[in-house]
């Protein structure tokens, strides 16, 4: 056991880092904050950690949604050959050289100009040679080389990554992938259906298109809520809006065709739907299904 958690909480990210490496925190409103690893209070294996809001100068109306561990912000070769790629819920993507984030400021900086009615969704570290994949609620996904996104300054708002079908459609996830890296594509719908498909099923296209079908969205499946890059060494933590939580191994899911409906991952109570999906390191423990009070079902 690496840490204790509060009720309804679980460990989602685990980083191996030295004291002098940096953690970059990206917020919903498009700001970036820094912390040296040694500035994070050290705890025991049993401690529950500290709330991020107590460690960085985060406004009350903003929240952290992406974390990036950076090896060395003083290595010119490293910072000039890596990028931060961000996407918003409305399908805007932006790439900025890591060098632009190499001068930490206590109060953070603007990482992307967010347009009205939009919010930041994801931020990833890339090496300039990877592919970007996004999926939207209507069940479409697009894959394109990151070279199709030119590097921009921090004040820029970005360019179109995917064209959504209607104004209520939005991006649900972004992954950074490359052929041969061993990852499969995992999508989950709001009614608890999921599907693991091969990355090879998604042809590389140009940025800005409508994408291809990644899951057949029906009244039974509900709209798409999650996109993850997974391997057999991952677990999925599935959380519903009424408080049910289930953990399941990706290795229990077979690879299926891109346009299929998928399989039911969880039986939902009437009126319940999936709230969020997290990819976590595989557990050797048996999976447990918990109700809203935290009792094993």
Specify the residue positions occupied by each region the protein language model found.
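Short, structured "edge-of-domain" segments at secondary-structure transitions
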Residues: 1-297
């Amino acid at each position: 056991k690496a840490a204790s958690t509060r009720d309804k909480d679980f460990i989602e990210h685990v980083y191996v880092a030295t004291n002098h490496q940096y953690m970059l925190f990206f917020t919903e409103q498009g700001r970036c904050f820094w912390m040296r690893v040694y500035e994070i209070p050290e705890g025991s294996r049993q401690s529950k950690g500290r709330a991020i809001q107590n460690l960085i100068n985060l406004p009350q109306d903003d929240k952290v949604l992406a974390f990036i561990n950076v090896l060395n912000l003083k290595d010119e070769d490293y910072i000039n050959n890596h990028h931060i790629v961000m996407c918003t819920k409305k399908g805007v993507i932006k790439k900025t050289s890591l060098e632009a984030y190499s001068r930490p400021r206590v109060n953070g900086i603007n990482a992307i100009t967010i347009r009205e009615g939009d919010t930041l969704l994801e931020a990833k570290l890339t090496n300039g040679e990877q592919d970007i994949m996004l999926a939207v609620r209507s069940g479409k996904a697009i894959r394109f080389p990151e070279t199709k996104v030119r590097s921009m300054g921090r004040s820029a708002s970005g360019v179109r990554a995917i064209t959504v079908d209607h104004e209520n459609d939005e991006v649900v996830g972004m992954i950074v992938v490359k052929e041969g890296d061993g990852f499969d594509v995992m999508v989950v719908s709001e009614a608890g259906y999921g599907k693991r498909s091969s990355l090879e099923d998604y042809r590389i296209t140009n940025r800005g298109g409508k994408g291809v079908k990644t899951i057949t969205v029906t009244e039974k499946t509900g709209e798409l809520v999650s996109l993850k890059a997974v391997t057999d060494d991952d677990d999925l933590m599935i959380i519903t809006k009424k408080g049910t939580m289930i953990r399941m191994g990706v290795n229990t899911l077979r690879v299926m065709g891109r346009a299929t409906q998928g399989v039911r991952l969880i039986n939902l109570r009437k009126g319940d739907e999936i709230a969020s999906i997290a990819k976590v390191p595989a557990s050797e423990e048996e999976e447990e299904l918990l109700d809203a009070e935290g009792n094993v079902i």
